[in-house]
Amino acid sequence: MKRLTASLRLLTSALAMSLGQVPAWAQSAPASAAGPVLSLQLNAAQPSERDCRLTFVVNNALGADLSKAAFEIALFNDAGVVDRLTVLDFKALPAGKTKVTRFDLAGADCGKLSRVLINSATECTGVQPAACMRALKTSTKTAIAFGV
């Protein structure tokens, strides 16, 4: 009986140790293999003369060129109230490319901007119209909340 107990303990230990090493085929696929993604990052918000300049980094990993991509955004002030709605036109976004685009928002105060909300894709030419919103992944490098 002692031999059986010792053998079971040894077998249990070996099994527990082997579970820590997952074979490559069982590991998660990289994010790029998860499906098409249109990454949009709010990279900076800087005051300019009478304006707030928003800088975006966009990466088109949809697998197709976009001849035009534009999004309606809502800007929220520091009280959480919508200040305005506007459309940002990112123009052409080639497949597999990263692009930096800046927009000067006349009369906007960067210091009072608390949130940028993407309402909808007003243009998404090159893929199915809903693909730009469905595959959109947002992030921010600023203190301003950014997303859908």
Task: Cite the ranges covered by each PLM segment.
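Asparagine-centered strand-capping/turn motif at beta-strand->loop junctions
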Residues: 58-62
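Short acidic/proline- and small/hydrophobic-mixed sequence motifs that coincide with surface turns
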Residues: 65-68
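Short aromatic-acidic-glycine turn motif
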Residues: 75-86, 127
